[in-house]
Amino acid sequence: MAIRTGFCNPFLTQASGIKYNPRTGRGSNREFLHSYKTTMSSFQFLAPKCLDEDVPMEERKGVHVGTLSRPPKVYCNGKEVPILDFRCSSPWPRRVNIWGEIDFRGDKFDPRFNTFHVYDIVETTEAASNGDVSRFATATRPLGTVITLLGMSRCGKRVAVHVYGICQYFYINKAEVDTACGIRSGSELSVLLAECLRSSMITQNDATLNGDKNAFHGTSFKSASPESFRVEVIERTDVYYYDTQPCAFYRVYSPSSKFTNYLCDNFHPELKKYEGRVDATTRFLMDNPGFVSFGWYQLKPGVDGERVRVRPASRQLTLSDVEIDCMSDNLQAIPNDDSWPDYKLLCFDIECKSGGSNELAFPDATHLEDLVIQISCLLYSIPRQSLEHILLFSLGSCDLPQRYVQEMKDAGLPEPTVLEFDSEFELLIAFMTLVKQYAPEFATGYNIVNFDWAFIMEKLNSIYSLKLDGYGSINRGGLFKIWDVGKSGFQRRSKVKINGLISLDMYAIATEKLKLSSYKLDSVAREALNESKRDLPYKDIPGYYASGPNTRGIIGEYCIQDSALVGKLFFKYLPHLELSAVARLARITLTKAIYDGQQVRIYTCLLGLASSRGFILPDGGYPATFEYKDVIPDVGDVEEEMDEDESVSPTGTSSGRNVGYKGARVFDPDTGFYIDPVVVLDFASLYPSIIQAHNLCFTTLTLNFETVKRLNPSDYATFTVGGKRLFFVRSNVRESLLGVLLKDWLAMRKAIRARIPGSSSDEAVLLDKQQAAIKVVCNSVYGFTGVAQGFLPCLYVAATVTTIGRQMLLSTRDYIHNNWAAFERFITAFPDIESSVLSQKAYEVKVIYGDTDSVFIRFKGVSVEGIAKIGEKMAHIISTALFCPPIKLECEKTFIKLLLITKKKYIGVIYGGKVLMKGVDLVRKNNCQFINDYARKLVELLLYDDTVSRAAAEASCVSIAEWNRRAMPSGMAGFGRIIADAHRQITSPKLDINKFVMTAELSRPPSAYINRRLAHLTVYYKLVMRQGQIPNVRERIPYVIVAPTDEVEADAKSVALLRGDPLQNTAGKRCGEAKRKLIISDLAEDPIHVTSHGLSLNIDYYFSHLIGTASVTFKALFGNDTKLTERLLKRFIPETRVVNVKMLNRLQAAGFVCIHAPCWDNKMNTEAEITEEEQSHQIMRRVFCIPKAILHQS
């Protein structure tokens, strides 16, 4: 690496031309028309004192704070480079050619292009200047909304296309407005609307409101006039209810979203508004057939030959290569082109360090001394999936290990560029300048929404007072913001919205695509990529950072490695393809598809279809006035409605549902263990198919029988739901809008899937993501109607869907029992199975479980091979006999063995040998290895040992009352041996403590916990008390449970004082010192402390925990009674007697003889060995002979 020159620490040197004023605040900077920084003469200086290599070690604690009077700079390859001076050679790649007020494109630059791709859409508000007489000024006088399409031309230019003339509009019932306001025409309504705006509080107080933005709106509201609005009278129908008649509505066109939003809230709030919350972007996409939110467009002359206008650099809103102004008639969408231009991906990761008295504390962005010390940035080409640049931003000098640099070179990767900075602000302003100058279209990382972006934004806002509104695509007044940032690290989802920069967090993708006990990056990389990372514990970072450039290079390697793993995850799962397909299908922006949930996807689609058929959508819908007990709050049960082999989940946050629906439970499962074949029939796309088959919709529903009694009985269906009779007309009377959407989407999905086999590998991936996106949207339709506070709730429809689903399951059960219970009728229906009959006498068929969309059918007396062969025929016969298309049953799987535990919880072996589990976690991250290992052993024995399986099936048929006088089936001996072995291991004096370590995540600071008497918090406080290494937020704290001793009790008292919750004294029955009552969490201890101090583990706790864990899983064998299961499993434990050796010796010395006691060596005082054969004999005698009473366990 080149030798650095001029590496400046202002606290050690006074370089020429640089004036340093400690703690004098920020220098004043010149304000430009853009808010991103292009020049700075001074800035706040924050840097760790550990970088001061020329001062004594004892003086290197803490952080330098002050103001540095010079422009920010960066050191790269030994050279000093100004960060903000665009004329200087840049240490990072640039894609912009305009910076500040200077245009670097050159005279030969040709702005022309014809076709362009759109990836993001931004709404801005514009007010025309007085001298402008263009058609674009007319559209923004006094105020207008402009839609900006951001993307790239076919020829590679980054473009921004500003679309004028897009008006929001809303509807309001004419008769109601005329009555309320005493008017009769649209012109009179325009006058009232303008008066409402001019008299608004914003207008009256614009001089005192916070900031220019409100003042601007106040000025524009003052200038509102009747001419600002266009009002039409039009006939439309409310989408709610079949008996709603068409009537006259005022359609009010407003040039500004600010006008529309204010009027919908404040102009006669008691009057219902329709579609007032539909934004201008949605109107642009919906009112122009074929327009897409993500895809290709081409430019064309307008209806009257009007042409587009190229903006000069001085008027550009962004730093795009070209900006043009146009109207919507200058645009034409290009269908069936799924190609992507050369969009760029920024993959980044930050490393932080606390600079306070405790360097191991978790960094807080609001603390001035907690610093970002490194940022790794990997820059990719998305369509080529190639890594193009590697950058490492480092606070202080940094030398990457030569080994690592050579490894990257050997792998054919770009050589990392190391950028070094004197202060944190220079590092952060350089990173933000890279974001602005390189202008990547997409960004990713691991937990960047909750941590990396949040930390950077908070630090720049609260510590450095740097506005970020100009660092997205928009140069000033843009969006660069995070909502709902959670303080509990990984536990909460937030939203990040940056104009022109789509953030896809791979942590969110990993939690939806993978089912793991831990979602740390290392765990995800092992599972998804079969790679592991070189871990660097957070506790080591302060020491590495303070030790010089070589060890800082180790941190840099770690930082780059994390970004590289995330980049590989991105191109493995390709979330951008699936989400862009969702955005295109739902006609919403990509950012909305990621962060705004399911509701908006269905709403926009329904809006377009409703509009084409003369319906309008009321804001907020209408509340349902009934209770439906079978409709249970839930969010997650509709994902299973389509083919299981295509497990695709929507990305991003949930839809914000506070009320949802779960498939109605029809009958409780017949719990137990089955060794007869159990076939599972599933309804394909249950809820979408019910909506289609029964024509359910807002528009086909009526609550009034008088409305339908004039129709033929075959023209409507009646359902009783929650005590109300609901009527839905058939499709020949009025077609369901929801049904039409589903029919079109499913037909589209089928066509796309048919194209996949004949496509190239790249095209097949894209098509697969498209069909998956359709599946996601289809599965959202049912939930859309069932959210009470949603966009357009209709609980009647949602409740009817679950009612029909319940009836379908009941009718399926009755059909099976009525038609196939008799062996002769079963053979008649399935003559091919006669050769697979094992015993005609033993033949029996029974539906043992039915829930949501599945029916579990047990067959006795027929081989599993035979049942597996007729499964599809069985499904077809039932579907044809009972249901109308598109409802159909499919044979999903056939179990060879099945442990049916409770509703939605089972474990089984399906035909073919694969183990399938639902709702059961054999290996839980909160359990120790000992418990997980034995729980797994017990399940594997149950499923794979035929002797144990038969015995378990026998046991599951025994009633609860019989077990007090009944022995275990002899075949359960193997089960007992495993439990006895577990007991032997845990009572052995040579325990491996590592097998008993449990962990729990410190999800927030201890002070933020309501209940602090938790095991991992106990260990946290003990480490504080012993001045050990303190865990940080998001770290998992290991602990074990120890036996209660005087030392443990003393520690518990100290911990109670530390957490501010002293243990209460409870006086005993006798006089003397009061005893403190300890709970399990008080017995938690640091494993290292246990090992070093020879503390004993709490054997009773661990074995009880194992028995408890096993009982939850195996209670289905014993009548689903957990307590009974625990008692029965304890029968397998060898009975032991605790012998008081001192007392035994005293009694023997007094002449007493020990009878039935173990053999003891009085000299060694140790228990003699019992042979394994004798021990097994004792176990079997105890378990399989009927005891007179439940044996006492010590």
UniProtKB/Swiss-Prot annotation:
It comes from Varicella-zoster virus (strain Dumas). GO terms for biological process: DNA-templated DNA replication; viral DNA genome replication. It is found in: Host nucleus. Keywords: DNA replication, DNA-binding, DNA-directed DNA polymerase, Endonuclease, Host nucleus, Hydrolase, Multifunctional enzyme, Nuclease, Nucleotidyltransferase, Transferase, Viral DNA replication. The lineage of its organism: Viruses, Duplodnaviria, Heunggongvirae, Peploviricota, Herviviricetes. SUPFAM superfamilies: DNA/RNA polymerases, Ribonuclease H-like. Its EC number is 2.7.7.7, 3.1.26.4. Belongs to the DNA polymerase type-B family. It holds the Pfam family DNA_pol_B. GO terms for molecular function: DNA binding; DNA-directed DNA polymerase activity; nucleotide binding; RNA-DNA hybrid ribonuclease activity. The keyword Iron does not apply. It catalyses: DNA(n) + a 2'-deoxyribonucleoside 5'-triphosphate = DNA(n+1) + diphosphate; Endonucleolytic cleavage to 5'-phosphomonoester. Disulfide bonds: none annotated. Its main location: host cell. This is DNA polymerase catalytic subunit. It comes from the Viruses. One of its GO terms (cellular component) is host cell nucleus. Transmembrane segments: none annotated. Replicates viral genomic DNA. The replication complex is composed of six viral proteins: the DNA polymerase, processivity factor, primase, primase-associated factor, helicase, and ssDNA-binding protein. Additionally, the polymerase contains an intrinsic ribonuclease H (RNase H) activity that specifically degrades RNA/DNA heteroduplexes or duplex DNA substrates in the 5' to 3' direction. Therefore, it can catalyze the excision of the RNA primers that initiate the synthesis of Okazaki fragments at a replication fork during viral DNA replication. Forms a complex with the ssDNA-binding protein, the DNA polymerase processivity factor, and the alkaline exonuclease. Interacts with the helicase-primase complex composed of the primase, the helicase and the primase-associated factor; this interaction may coordinate leading and lagging strand DNA synthesis at the replication fork.
